[in-house]
Regions:
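Compact, glycine-rich, soluble single-domain proteins
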Residues: 1-117
Length: 117
């Protein structure tokens, strides 16, 4: 995993602790067999255009992003045993349920990735 943070293009920090998948196994595992994310955590899965919560015990919020990190779709509180997808996305940010409203993330917003030093 690669660790970093996501900001809006105006430098407003969105998520301080983001893990980005770096290989196939990390993408396949996702959040399976893990504790729920906290408000300030996220998992960025790339490349990815669909997500499932099969086998998970908790709901998550999803942010589908294109290659330029523009939000193309959001999904609120995807419950366990469900699937969500977006043909326009190349990566997905998984967040704790109810994070979208707190972070004020909406379609069309531009994000930026920053590696941890």
């Amino acid at each position: 995993m690669i660790h970093g943070r996501l900001t809006r293009t105006n430098a407003d920090c969105v998520i301080q602790n983001v893990s980005k998948t770096s290989n196939f196994l990390e993408r396949m595992r996702g959040l399976l067999i893990s504790s729920p994310l906290t408000e300030n955590e996220g998992l960025l899965i790339a490349p990815c255009s669909s997500v499932h919560t099969i086998g998970m015990r908790y709901a998550i919020d999803l942010v589908f992003l294109d290659r330029q990190l523009t939000i193309v779709k959001t999904v609120r509180s995807l419950k366990p045993w469900r699937i969500a997808a977006s043909n326009a996305s190349s990566m997905v940010l998984e967040l704790a349920a109810d994070s979208l409203d707190k972070l004020q993330l909406t379609t069309g917003q531009q994000l930026e990735w920053h590696d941890d030093p």
